[in-house]
Amino acid sequence: MSNNAVKSESQAVVSEEDELRAQLYEFLATLLRVEPTDAVVKKVADLSGDDTPIGQASSTLAHLAQKMDGTSVRNEYVDLFIGVGRGELLPYCSYYLTGFLNEKPLAKLRQDMAAIGIARADGVKEPEDHIASLCD
């Protein structure tokens, strides 16, 4: 038996589908966490897709990014998530479940994360129910 055929219990085997899913969620987190840089806008503009729903959405997103400059994209991000006083959308799960920020759903999420050994990353100021954190 080859060494490659034997896996220790500490090594996880991740399917290609799960790896691609993780990459997609990481990309979404990048888009939702902060105002996108010019490099991120370029990365979005370079996306390509296939005939699947996600592929079609990727192609549409790329097409839109090709038509916009970085400043316009950042302004849209600010309008959506920051705004004057408040953005058009609040990127926090608690708000959509209870109508308030930092409510029981956030406390439950923190308990669930602690139970499986996940903690908020050092330096992250947003609460764990921020959409970018959930995508991470």
What are these regions (language model features)?
Residues M1-D136:
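Surface/interface-facing alpha-helical segments and adjacent flexible terminal/loop regions used
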